[in-house]
């Protein structure tokens, strides 16, 4: 794993750490379920405190189209073993008394959703990876990829004025806001783009 700076030095340290499993498509639902299940075991496996709390989540719909959307998402989540319950407005009010429910057309409750400490989750994942033989190199920037016959063949890197190349047949592009640019360099479209967000102290 090549990390251009230090692990968690990007936006990870101030992320909300929300663990939600209600997603818009099949693959994202499967990934969210896998991640939530993994995060509940990480602390025991690595000894790194993750702050994982399964406090549950509520999703509400105020329009008919949103109602159909969350009910479809709930059905898909259920098919993958995610615990999700459609609840009445009365049950919604009991779970969250501050919420005005008069205009709510549908609500779902996911009791295994929750929150974690994103920086510590990343460190626990890194420790678990190292325990399983992964080598992590910090302060190493990926500068390019080579391909041969339509497949990746090597990764070029730069670190503190030194450069190098790693021969490989597989690359996982985890470059965050630079993933699109890195993919484009070898003709791969990565459907990501950077967007502004806010953090209030």
Model-derived regions, located:
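Glycine-rich FAD pyrophosphate-binding loop
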Residues: 1-13
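Dinucleotide-binding Rossmann-like beta1-alpha1 core, especially the glycine-rich loop
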Residues: 17-95
